Amino acid sequence: MSPGNWKTTMVVRGILLILYGLLLQPEPGTATLPLLMDSVIQALAELERKSPATEAGHIASMWLLSAQGSGAHNPLPRFLLEGQSLKTAKLAPPSLSPEFQGLIEEVARHGVQDGKEYGVVLAPDGSTVAVEPLLAGLEAGLQGHRVVNLPLDSTATFPDIGATVPDLKATSSAHKDTSADVNSADVGTLSPNVRDTDVDAEVTFLDVRPSSTGVQVTSPDVQVSSPDTKAKSPTTVDSLLMVTLARDLGLHFLQGAQTESNSGLGTEGCWDQLSLPRTFTLLDPEASPLTMAFLNGALDGALLGDYLSKVPEPRPPLSHLLNQYYGAGVAGDPGLRSNFRRQNGAALTLTPNLTQQVWGTLILLQRLEPAHPQLQGMSQEQLAQVATHAAKEFTEAFLGCPAIHPRCRWGAAPYRGSPKPLKLPLGFLYIHHTYVPARPCTDFALCAANMRSMQRFHLDTQGWDDIGYSFVVGSDGYVYEGRGWHWVGAHTRDHNSRGFGVALIGNYTAELPSEAALRAVRDELPHCAVRAGLLQPDYALLGHRQLVRTDCPGDALFNMLRTWPRFNMNVKPRTARRASGRSKRRLPLMIPLATDLQ
């Protein structure tokens, strides 16, 4: 690596860890900025502008260690970071405006308390993102996509207190000048289920090295689904997945058995306002810390960390990278953006590998913190079962489901009157197109505006109690909640109580929706509804025109529906009545002949 590229890398890492370190220097009376991802990006840009290149490389890891010591105890970032003892240097981060200082203090620690979620921001795509796991993933990626070798024998112990990981300073070309002195007060203590007689005289040390092939899967023959199978411990864990997802997934599922339909993952919430958000209230006041915002931030951190670990030098400034990721796409790739985090995350966190990562992370935590109340006394087989359950639930209940924006996110007006509950599970999905709006919406602002427009039309012109559809699918990667899973809609006349009405925004008479929108309707939405007991396993899919005289959902889309496995071809389409030319001219411009009016 050239000296210039090395300096660039050190500056980028320094900026990130200065952001952590500023938590230790609160300023009284700081002004408040809206809790937007754009505000975080502006703060990063300010840090990048003020940080001298000669200092950034030396203070990066130390700032993260300092911030780690100021919050809830999590030994993994401290254990993984390279750098000298904090006592060897005095740190002097650049001064920021009171507004940016206050923002950094407010968002860099994630937490859930009294039904409120803290440390989260609203992103341009409409999603809410926890900043802490995002920053952890960026830092792990800047270190290089590294693999941590666990002891080959599950009963082996870690080095005694004060032991130095050998050759650590040569593990990454970006950090060759960094001497390692990785200490932990707990690493020399035996795991609760380790016998003294089992400890090999030659202790296996942890080795951290860059992974040239991405995430490594170890022990591929392990069978962790059966409690009667003696599990073999994984031999490596990936540091990127460890600090973003694996630790929190493992600890979450250690807390108690979860049902198949309610894993406690991904609780959504509502902002006090969308233009200047300040307070985020969870829809479930008893939600676990693994909220939708946390999982979004963790996935974003893992994806961007993976990108940073592979992108050639010089690496982009973090503010530039985040601006692209939460905008049009990283490096001009519209697929690599926050709208499609779940699809991209599914490729990065394949279930067998994620099981190994969660299991290995729990093993590492058990060695680092033998007195951990959740890990104490847990056998390897028990940890394997927890990891298997965690990976399965995360993959099926989160990655395999569409991202659904709740009503409050698009600014829905309240329901008029009292909604009528559905008798679940239902047996049908009824597919519509909106016709008006005719153009597919490809960003949150336009999709949300379309939702509000349709709701106003359904309320004020049609005289309905709410927007008619159960769900509406945009071309921005998101599904928008209409009446939702539990309330009778107004979408398919005489059939509203028998099925969910799902509309795709756009006119699909001659063109097809995006592949992402089709996948959400064909695969993701029904899969998750069946899994949650909302839709019958033998459900059927019908086009609107099969039940009502209408051209909906458009010829192109309907012909596509006919090729889908769940399509019920036994119900023949009903031909739409055509109005005379005179009556057509009398129709309001906002209500075309083929528009979806039940």
Swiss-Prot record:
Zn(2+) binds at residues 432, 544, 552. Gene3D superfamilies: Peptidoglycan recognition protein-like. GO terms for cellular component: extracellular region; membrane. Glycans are attached at residues 353, 507. InterPro entries: Amidase/PGRP_sf, Amidase_domain, PGRP, PGRP_domain_met/bac. PANTHER family: N-ACETYLMURAMOYL-L-ALANINE AMIDASE, PEPTIDOGLYCAN RECOGNITION PROTEIN. This is N-acetylmuramoyl-L-alanine amidase. The gene is PGLYRP2.
